[in-house]
Amino acid sequence: MAGHNKWSKVKHIKAKEDAKKGKVFTKAVRDIMTAVRDGGPNPDTNAALRLAIERAKAVSMPQDNIKRAIDKASGNLPGVKYEEITYEGYGPGGVAIMVECLTDNKNRTVASVRHAFSKSGGSLGTSGSVSWMFEKKGVITVERDENEDAIMEAALESGANDILEFDEVLVIETDPADFNQVLEAVEKAGAKILESSVGLVATNEIDVDDATAEKVERLIDMLEENDDVQNVYHNMK
């Protein structure tokens, strides 16, 4: 029985590790697909895609998975037509939520998204109901180090709009059109880039209590479990 118990624990640990790896792979795939949609499928001319591929390789994602993600985002999978759809609505506590999807079946996707909102006490809205609370920006997160002055200078000189300083990271914001050139500039300046993407940023964040925050996080988790969902944005602090 001791051996059985030990194996049960090993299986449990392996299941947790597999789940963790699955989430890491899912994020890597989404980062690649977002980069392709924003800047095209060529990593030689799309710095965000090149970095997303490097991050995917760093977590041991197979090359076939990387290629499939690029082909899916660029519409090159044979016999399948994907389209981009954005859903918007309110989560618990009136938190505004935007859900970017890439799907080959709109009916399936909207049913899944609506179910997640309803189950979490939120409501799926109509087009334009919350999108006015967000603006599209390039966001580059880099690690702070002794080279940060040169990194900030490179970012600003290449067109960055703002740099937010936190304890361990710098968050560089750009116009979408300037994103790639700023990304390349800070990379050349020696920045260790942790995340980089063009996405939606809330223009005004709202405070919610801990219980509401947990409900919103559960809604986001439910949405992100859907393979059709590419990105989820919200205005919760």
UniProtKB/Swiss-Prot annotation:
Keywords: Cytoplasm, DNA-binding, Transcription, Transcription regulation. The keyword Transferase does not apply. GO terms for cellular component: cytosol. One of its GO terms (molecular function) is DNA binding. Pfam families: TACO1_YebC_N, Transcrip_reg. It comes from the Bacteria. One of its GO terms (biological process) is regulation of DNA-templated transcription. It is found in: Cytoplasm. The keyword Transferase does not apply. Belongs to the TACO1 family. This is Probable transcriptional regulatory protein NIS_0560. It comes from Nitratiruptor sp. (strain SB155-2). The lineage of its organism: Bacteria, Pseudomonadati, Campylobacterota, Epsilonproteobacteria, Nautiliales.
